[in-house]
Amino acid sequence: MNLHEYQAKQIFAQYRLPVSKGIVCHSLDDAVSAIHTLAGDTWAAKCQVHAGGRGKAGGVKLVRSEAEIREFCHQWLGQRLVTFQTDKNGQLVNTIYLEETCLIERELYLGAVIDRSSQKIVFMASNAGGMNIEDVAAQTPELIHKATIDPLTGAQAFQGRELAFKLGLSGDQIKQFAHLFVQLAKLFIEKDLALLEVNPLVLTKQGQLLCLDAKMVIDSNALYRHPELKALQDPSQEDAREADAAKWDLNYVALDGNIGCMVNGAGLAMGTMDIVKLHGGRPANFLDVGGGATKERVSEAFKLILSDQNVKAVLVNIFGGIVRCDLIAEGIIAAVNEVGINIPVIVRLEGTNAELGREILANSGLRLIAANTLTQAAQLAVKAAEGK
């Protein structure tokens, strides 16, 4: 689950991490009032959406007067911001975060992710702050310095000092960085994060380190332990279909193709999408119905797929391991009858009672096309989507 920048910074402040003073604005009146409360004569106005690249898209701007903040609010509040990380529709701007500015001496990068191979947390630091860290890793990997944290022992101050030396910090800056490093690691572990980024982490002209931006992604599997974080969820930033899928424990990701895919198992789902692409098709979604492909879940899965007007055919690829293929076939038939599908549905069943499942589908009298192999299923789906 993603958090907005202002939400992440509020949590940063709880962990004694240095952040600029800011005010959350939900309306034009809030923003006008905020500039009279904040210090200075220049403020940073930031659209709050769950996507990077806001600055390049015009969603972050320095404002110096009431007229400028009015113009910014009129431009963005209630509108959709399109960045390189969003789809063509962008994401809705409901909130603008207005904060005090500072004079910047240097921009750094500091982030943390989970390394699943070592089962540890990896911190990455770089002098290339303010840039996309993926680009830095690809073009100048020598600029990225790493520290590995064992969740059992937590971060140690000496690790922070080592990173500070590598970043060229000196004097009191090293002490500040070590504190920041240890507290970020503590936050990462205690809040069950999947990703944490401060980009940029700036060194001000006064020699103070400041978290100018903040990104937090919480492991959704751990939200049951953090009701206070669950309460921060912003449904307006999520795909409505993906939110509906989550209610039924369906893993759904919308794509831009025209062949709907319904599969049980994430690996098989990705393989199915690959083979559809291999044969010239374009998947409209990733959809994993999981091991318990019941009638109700299959029905909801069909509804999700058909809610996309671009879908011209549906490919169902089920491996009957945990559940029998004959039961899956009955579930598919019941779901098709309930939903009322008027586009081709290609079904490939394999595993326990697969032959019986295919026989049930063939005798259903419905517009279901049975396939014996995944290759055949993909080819049939591509032809059906093309109207052949």
Curated annotation (Swiss-Prot):
InterPro entries: ATP-grasp_succ-CoA_synth-type (IPR013650), ATP_grasp_subdomain_1 (IPR013815), Succ-CoA_synthase_bsu_CS (IPR017866), SUCC_ACL_C (IPR005811), Succ_CoA_ligase-like_bsu (IPR005809), Succinyl-CoA_synth-like (IPR016102). It comes from the Bacteria. ATP binds at residues 46, 53-55, 99, 102, 107. Mg(2+) binds at residues 199, 213. Signal peptide: none annotated. Binds 1 Mg(2+) ion per subunit. Keywords: ATP-binding, Ligase, Magnesium, Metal-binding, Nucleotide-binding, Tricarboxylic acid cycle. Its cofactor is Mg(2+). It comes from Actinobacillus pleuropneumoniae serotype 3 (strain JL03). It catalyses: succinate + ATP + CoA = succinyl-CoA + ADP + phosphate; GTP + succinate + CoA = succinyl-CoA + GDP + phosphate. One of its GO terms (biological process) is succinyl-CoA metabolic process. This is Succinate--CoA ligase [ADP-forming] subunit beta.
